[in-house]
Amino acid sequence: MSQLHKRFTSEQLKELLDRYLKNEIERKYTQEILGIRKRRFFVLLKQYKDNPQHFTVQYRRTRAPRTISPMTEQNILKELSIDKKIIQNKEIPLKSYNYSYIKDRLRVTYHQKVSLPTIIDRAKKHGFYLKKPKRTLHDREVLTRYAGELIQHDASHHLWAPASQEKWYLITSLDDYSRFMLYAILLKTETSWAHILALQTVILRYGLPYAYYVDSHSIFRFVRGRDSLWYKHHLLTDETTPQWKQVLQDCNVKITYALSPQAKGKIERPYGWLQDRLIRTCVRGDVKEIKHAQRVLNHELYRYNHQQVHSTTQEIPYLRFQRALTERQSLFREFTIKPPYQSVKDIFCLRMDRTIDPYRRISINNLQLKLNHASPGKTVNLRIYPSTIEVSEIRCWSEGKLIDVQRIKNTDLKGVHF
């Protein structure tokens, strides 16, 4: 209901109060006509009785309303226009305006302080407003009580920097309890090795978590009927172990799979804030190179981890994470190399088995390697660690012993899927 002074003139109000005082109309009917409560009614009645001649309900503004400058107005509309173009681009995974981002951008870039309701008001007036779709419930929730109880790991393939005209992969790892982002990197190609490097970075820095939570991507899980068209299906789901999964098995870390897109949605929602700002900043910065985009990502990652209060936990992720570690509310364990292995290169690596021929050689596709201390007929387990872009270190294990170490050009390892 609108304000009293907008619905009644002072004279109309005087008449109603005067009739009440003369017992011509009961209070409850007067209140209903005016649309006010008992307390407000008696406040007005007292004011009328104290000064009937000068009684008024007309609102008098004591100071001019706050307004924004034309330049600020122009910048708001400029930023809203950029967002509109982003939303209209079907290649970009953004479907709504982010008024909070625009508020932050006005403050940081233009040094203009504007309230969020003001930005939303201008958006509605100038056609930069979309109704939010109703959220659908997902069929699984992951609830954790400890840091390291569950690490949400994901990869998203999108046009993060539209000016580059190239889609990149964003690989991320996030602690479910604290919402602290442990790892984030942009890559042009997604490989098993890229995900293994993510494991190595997180585990060596923070320790071994209790479990990882991922989708059923072929890098994380072999699924019958999907991952090999020529396969005769003698193997069922999970009877073939992907490289990434073998690393976690060596580390004694459990894996939990999201069995539906709805369940996986819980993984993706915490990343939404980071992804949203990454795209909007790359658009405004005309970012074309992946190295430049990574710098933008690092900046937004720091802001997310150390400055932003998370909407779910109502805490800054870094502070919540550190408090959990300090108070021993953590399931992270110290990483140690599993015997008989000697180096992290034996754990965070690609693996394959070969049989040593009578000439103490093995073959990797068309590449033949002669091994030292090899026994013909024995099986050798190759642990391949890409040391650089050009060279990989192959560590050869047989019967629990490291029998040889060789360095090979990656171009010679054709057929090995990094």
Which role does the model predict for each range below?
Residues 149-170, 176-292, 405-412, 418:
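RNase H-like DDE/DDD metal-dependent nuclease/strand-transfer catalytic core used by mobile genetic elements
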Residues 48-52, 112-113, 121-134:
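Short, basic alpha-helical nucleic acid-contact segments in DNA-binding proteins
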Residues 25-26, 98:
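Residues that mark the N-terminal boundary/hinge immediately upstream of a DNA-recognition element
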Residues 138-151:
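Structured nucleic-acid-interacting core domains from mobile-element enzymes and related host factors
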Residues 2-7, 27-82:
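Short, basic alpha-helical/linker "hinge" immediately adjacent to a nucleic-acid-recognition surface
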Residues 305-418:
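C-terminal, beta-rich DNA-binding module of retroviral/retroelements integrases
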Residues 43, 104, 117, 121:
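DNA-binding alpha-helical recognition surfaces that contact promoter or target DNA
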Residues 63-115, 156-161:
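A short, amphipathic alpha-helix used for macromolecular contacts
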